[in-house]
């Protein structure tokens, strides 16, 4: 028994090391790749100081943090709702952030600065999260709370569609591109959004014990003495914050939170002591690679990264759906 535990521990360490190396390679490639390839030896040249340190580095850090946040949010939601198909957009938080952004553009008549739009997007996400917490305080089952999130997402999506469809504002039409996800406008001015993700990411990665209990199911978690109501509220709020900040930073990006945790579980990373940091590393790597594809796929334009993740993630989602039906 002890030998099996040690073998599993060594395997988990190998996985984390491999994912760390993959993330570092993706980070290095992201800094080098672009319209002009800049090798590490040229990073401190005048050209490198402009393209690498002022343009590519803030974008790369944003992609890394958003990918980690979305993947960890997916792992938390899948444990919280006991559903392998749960993902960050499922609770309607992403669409809530979109509604907040559209409301800011309408009320500000396109004159608000980018940081104000970001705050409004976070506020929209947190409002949806507070509504979900109201449902959670009624001690609803996870399935009903999940359905409440789906309903809120549909309502927010309808509000965004109505606002954009009847708008003559160029800014609102450009929001459709923003909602498809993209890091094209990210620079050091958005560093406060990046910093807002780091404390919550680190905190959730340290909560493996309650996450392991939640993964056993509500009844088992209660029997083990876990204050279920408290942890459900805290985790929903933390997920809402991470998704809201991610949407404010890069728009709506799907499938990272769905695919990454499930693939890692299939690889044997079921213990949240390993799964949570593994999701952070794998999510960051996957989104970095998707961002590189979005930048290089077209010569004269940049693909929305949400299109890339949807193209790669949709077949996996269908496979998971068919597997769940069995």
Swiss-Prot record:
Entry membrane topology: Multi-pass membrane protein
Annotated SUPFAM superfamilies: ABC transporter involved in vitamin B12 uptake, BtuC
InterPro entries per the UniProt record, alphabetical: ABC_BtuC-like, ABC_transptr_BtuC, ABC_transptr_permease_BtuC
Alphabetical UniProt keywords: Cell inner membrane, Cell membrane, Membrane, Transmembrane, Transmembrane helix, Transport
Transmembrane segments: 15-35, 61-81, 88-108, 112-132, 146-166, 184-204, 240-260, 274-294, 302-322
Gene Ontology biological process: cobalamin transport
A GO MF term: vitamin transmembrane transporter activity
Highest taxon listed in the record's lineage: Bacteria
Pfam families per UniProt: FecCD (PF01032)
Subcellular location: Cell inner membrane
GO CC terms: plasma membrane
Subunit details: The complex is composed of two ATP-binding proteins (BtuD), two transmembrane proteins (BtuC) and a solute-binding protein (BtuF).
Cited function: Part of the ABC transporter complex BtuCDF involved in vitamin B12 import. Involved in the translocation of the substrate across the membrane.
Annotated family: Belongs to the binding-protein-dependent transport system permease family. FecCD subfamily.
Protein name: Vitamin B12 import system permease protein BtuC
Gene name linked to the record: btuC
């Amino acid at each position: 028994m002890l030998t099996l535990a040690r073998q599993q521990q060594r395997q988990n360490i190998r996985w984390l090391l491999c994912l760390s190396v993959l993330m570092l390679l993706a980070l290095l490639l992201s800094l080098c790749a672009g319209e002009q390839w800049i090798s590490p030896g040229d990073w401190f040249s005048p050209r490198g100081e402009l393209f690498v340190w002022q343009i590519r580095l803030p974008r790369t850090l944003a992609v890394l943090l958003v990918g980690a946040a979305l993947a960890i949010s997916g792992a938390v939601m899948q444990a919280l709702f006991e559903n392998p198909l749960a993902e960050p957009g499922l609770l309607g938080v992403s669409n809530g952030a979109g509604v907040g952004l559209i409301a800011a553009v309408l009320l500000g008549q396109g004159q608000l600065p980018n940081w104000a739009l970001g705050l409004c997007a976070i506020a929209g996400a947190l409002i949806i999260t507070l509504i979900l917490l109201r449902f959670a305080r009624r001690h609803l089952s996870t399935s009903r709370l999940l359905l409440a999130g789906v309903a809120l997402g549909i309502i927010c999506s309808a509000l965004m569609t109505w606002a954009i469809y009847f708008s003559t504002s160029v800014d609102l039409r450009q929001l459709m591109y923003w909602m498809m996800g993209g890091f094209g406008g990210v620079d050091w001015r958005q560093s406060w959004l990046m910093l807002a993700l780091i404390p919550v990411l680190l905190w959730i990665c340290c909560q493996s014990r309650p996450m392991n209990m939640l993964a056993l199911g509500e009844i088992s978690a209660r029997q083990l003495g876990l204050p279920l109501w408290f942890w459900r509220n805290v985790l929903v709020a933390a997920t809402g914050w991470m998704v809201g900040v991610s949407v404010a930073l890069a728009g709506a990006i799907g499938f990272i939170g769905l695919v990454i945790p499930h693939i890692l579980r299939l690889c044997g990373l079921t213990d949240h002591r390993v799964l949570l940091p593994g999701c952070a590393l794998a999510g960051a790597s996957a989104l970095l690679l998707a961002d590189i594809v979005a930048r290089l796929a077209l010569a004269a334009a940049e693909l929305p990264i949400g299109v890339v993740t949807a193209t790669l993630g949709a077949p996996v989602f269908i496979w998971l759906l068919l597997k769940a039906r069995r």
